[in-house]
């Protein structure tokens, strides 16, 4: 197959995969636009459109979480595995929420501290309950929930 034909086929496939782009105008106060441009550069976006798309997607993900849709998230825990029963309580809690947990990863940071990453999927309320339950375990030093989308509701 010639390279020109290969490039045409690739371009056709990519054009079918991408949504139709629509241009629209946005009116902003100059100081707000200046701050947005600083943010856009700081986050290394190639242009304002990419930055704006990400802001819209972040809002759509938040709406998914508020509406009770099926969502995904990662829960990151830091704990001292030498603390009495903390590892057992973390594992017990994971078993209690086994329907929501996709996978876990356990990393030894140093002699005392462990990093546990829990990937979860389910109704937003259930994933939030799992994060709260893990966060509340005595001996967990830090816990965060990173909320995301299954991708079905956002383009």
Where are these regions (language model features)?
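Short Lys/Arg-rich basic patches
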Residues: 4-27
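Short amphipathic alpha-helical segments
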Residues: 26-28, 36, 46-57
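Short, charge-rich, low-complexity interaction segments located
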Residues: 52, 61-68
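Short glycine-/aliphatic-rich beta-strand segments at the starts of folded cytosolic domains
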Residues: 69-81, 115-116
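Short amphipathic alpha-helix segments
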Residues: 80-101
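Helix N-cap motif at beta-to-alpha junctions
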Residues: 82-83, 120-127
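Short amphipathic alpha-helices in soluble, non-transmembrane regions
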Residues: 89-93, 129-136
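Conserved short beta-strand edge segments in small beta-sheet-based binding/regulatory domains
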Residues: 99-107, 132, 136-151
């Amino acid at each position: 197959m010639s390279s020109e034909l290969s490039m045409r086929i690739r371009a056709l496939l990519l054009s079918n995969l991408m949504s139709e782009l629509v241009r629209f105008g946005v009116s902003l106060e100059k100081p707000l636009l200046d701050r947005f441009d600083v943010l856009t550069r700081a986050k290394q976006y190639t242009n304002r459109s990419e930055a704006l798309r990400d802001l819209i997607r972040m809002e759509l993900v938040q709406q998914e979480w508020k509406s009770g849709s099926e969502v995904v998230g990662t829960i990151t825990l830091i704990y001292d595995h030498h603390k009495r029963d903390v590892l057992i309580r973390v594992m017990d809690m994971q078993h209690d929420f086994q329907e929501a947990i996709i996978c876990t990863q356990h990393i030894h940071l140093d002699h005392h501290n462990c990093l546990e990453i829990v990937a979860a999927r389910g109704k937003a309320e259930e994933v939030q309950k799992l994060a709260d339950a893990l966060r509340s375990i005595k001996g967990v030093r830090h816990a965060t929930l990173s909320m995301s989308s299954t991708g079905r509701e956002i383009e």
